[in-house]
Amino acid sequence: MNKKILETLEFDKVKALFEPHLLTEQGLEQLRQLAPTAKADKIKQAFAEMKEMQALFVEQPHFTILSTKEIAGVCKRLEMGADLNIEEFLLLKRVLLTSRELQSFYANLENVSLEELALWFEKLHDFPQLQGNLQAFNDAGFIENFASEELARIRRKIHDSESQVRDVLQDLLKQKAQMLTEGIVASRNGRQVLPVKNTYRNKIAGVVHDISASGNTVYIEPREVVKLSEEIASLRADERYEMLRILQEISERVRPHAAEIANDAWIIGHLDLIRAKVRFIQERQAVVPQLSENQEIQLLHVCHPLVKNAVANDVYFGQDLTAIVITGPNTGGKTIMLKTLGLTQVMAQSGLPILADKGSRVGIFEEIFADIGDEQSIEQSLSTFSSHMTNIVDILGKVNQHSLLLLDELGAGTDPQEGAALAMAILEDLRLRQIKTMATTHYPELKAYGIETAFVQNASMEFDTATLRPTYRFMQGVPGRSNAFEIAKRLGLSEVIVGDASQQIDQDNDVNRIIEQLEEQTLESRKRLDNIREVEQENLKMNRALKKLYNELNREKETELNKAREQAAEIVDMALSESDQILKNLHSKSQLKPHEIIEAKAKLKKLAPEKVDLSKNKVLQKAKKKRAPKVGDDIVVLSYGQRGTLTSQLKDGRWEAQVGLIKMTLEEKEFDLVQAQQEKPVKKKQVNVVKRTSGRGPQARLDLRGKRYEEAMNELDTFIDQALLNNMAQVDIIHGIGTGVIREGVTKYLQRNKHVKSFGYAPQNAGGSGATIVTFKG
């Protein structure tokens, strides 16, 4: 887009409004380079980035970015083979730190869906080794001792030598106190010296470095410290050389990544600029507009960003509308309206938010041209009319259907009749070429043109006749009218004179009356529209409040659920811990019978939470209510899925049952009755597939391959219980070889179990060390 329009509309001043919100020099540079584009994809991307950043601020209202300096020149020097100094390394260090902070922020971000911004966050590089290398430089511009072993060694020697010098000088201060003008150690030419009285200068051997202005004091470096000082000077030179070597070495390490670091700095600046745009939105109640690709413009309550206390106005430039002609007197805000339209378009096409209400739409124009203000060329000695016409002629040769044209006081500066005719002819040419134009004029002849011509609309700026002041409110569809008679009357002009004047232009008065009626209708419509907007705003506020309340309730609900889960988990952990202790006690009592161990385990398992199908529970409860159990009934033990028979009922309401070879004591809720006519096998609680063979009597096999350790141990425990209930003499456990963790767990479990007679690996042809055969006690 041409630079002249940006200067005319003062776009640089608008961009300056965003500068206070920037934190990085990279962001500032990108802001200054910002210019409007006609590429829809670029504009859409900028709009999407702002919307995502707004959503990010909702979840992270204090999101910030560490300040960084421009490093483009530093990276360029690296690529050219130059070595960096400490200050330049500190700039790179800051960029790497900022990049790492942003990556960490993005990794921990929750409840926000990002697409466009995610691309930038994910393009940031991570250089942990380089960050470690750059830690050698502290923020004070000092190379740390750990930068190299040699540097640390040299500095230790310097420290030791300086300590020796101090000790020697302190001793001399005490010994030669009467020969000194002051009891202090002074410094001259980088050397430690004593302030000796001139009369004793020959009493202290050493090098004279200075004499006081009075000649009474001679600054002598004692011979005892001269050699040490020379050693220190030599060590200082070694230190400087080693620091240069470190700078060269780290420069070589950073050099291959110069382009990536420069790119990271650009991304940091880009994120900073997006953040600044959203901060501007929050500060100025700006919006991200919708984008119309058919040049339709709809601006709701739009304001000029550079005008203090600007009046908000609505502008609608439909797809078929080619021209809006603003008529009426000067000083009413017509020029500001032109600039507001143009500047809003420039801001939007530059990817910036606009000062308008939600629902506003902007078009896309390849060029925006303007002839605004007095651009008279003094050098060419042209008149105002000639200057404007020269500019318009140039513009007419450049505009096309993809342009927006802004014309201020079209046809002014010449004979009113000829000026009006020229203005209409120019507007007609633009209309036929379908070029969107907003023009201002004070010629009344253009009112008729706006009324009679298709795709052209009149507009005006409201004037308050009561206060004799413009209101700066834009009235689209209503042509401007003359207020001369009303103003003259209010200023005290005789009513006779005003009446005589009005009779001379009765026809114009009729037009003014029509315009006045249109103004009243427009004002009434505007009031209704404002009321509707107020209701919409209230609804929006209510919706936001409800949404916020809903989210807060959900968060509170989730928090309470998490607390409940944690408390439940603590209870379960305590119960399981108690159960482990009970089991240890049970196992330690070898006289207990197998069925007593199994019954105890079944009760302990009830302590652990288990997912329950409530609907099935209701069905089971209804089924139980159909008939009370009695002695001799067949039952299914719910804990194991085993069938048995009720043998007797105890006084406390519990039942004794024969389950296989084991007698068990059960509560009524722990079993289900089996219908006498039901011949189908009861569906057991599935633990693992049990395979029976007829080779050595009843056998079972448990396959633990592919299981997690905890899952495998739980299944093993249940499987052994079932084997004991079924009175099995021997079972096979397949655990595989793998890492050996499950195999070791199986071995430890079997060693602890008092009912295991023996166990060992299967024969080689039956699984070898990948399977264990277990034999139970008789």
From Swiss-Prot:
It holds the Pfam family MutS_V. It comes from the Bacteria. SMART domains: MUTSac, MUTSd, SMR. Keywords: ATP-binding, DNA-binding, Endonuclease, Hydrolase, Nuclease, Nucleotide-binding, RNA-binding, rRNA-binding. ATP binds at residues 328-335. GO terms for molecular function: ATP binding; ATP hydrolysis activity; ATP-dependent DNA damage sensor activity; endonuclease activity; mismatched DNA binding; ribosomal large subunit binding; rRNA binding. GO terms for biological process: mismatch repair; negative regulation of DNA recombination; rescue of stalled ribosome. SUPFAM superfamilies: DNA repair protein MutS, domain III, P-loop containing nucleoside triphosphate hydrolases, SMR domain-like. Its EC number is 3.1.-.-, 3.6.4.-. Residues 702-777 form the Smr domain. Belongs to the DNA mismatch repair MutS family. MutS2 subfamily. Homodimer. Binds to stalled ribosomes, contacting rRNA. Endonuclease that is involved in the suppression of homologous recombination and thus may have a key role in the control of bacterial genetic diversity. Acts as a ribosome collision sensor, splitting the ribosome into its 2 subunits. Detects stalled/collided 70S ribosomes which it binds and splits by an ATP-hydrolysis driven conformational change. Acts upstream of the ribosome quality control system (RQC), a ribosome-associated complex that mediates the extraction of incompletely synthesized nascent chains from stalled ribosomes and their subsequent degradation. Probably generates substrates for RQC. This is Endonuclease MutS2. It comes from Streptococcus pneumoniae (strain CGSP14).
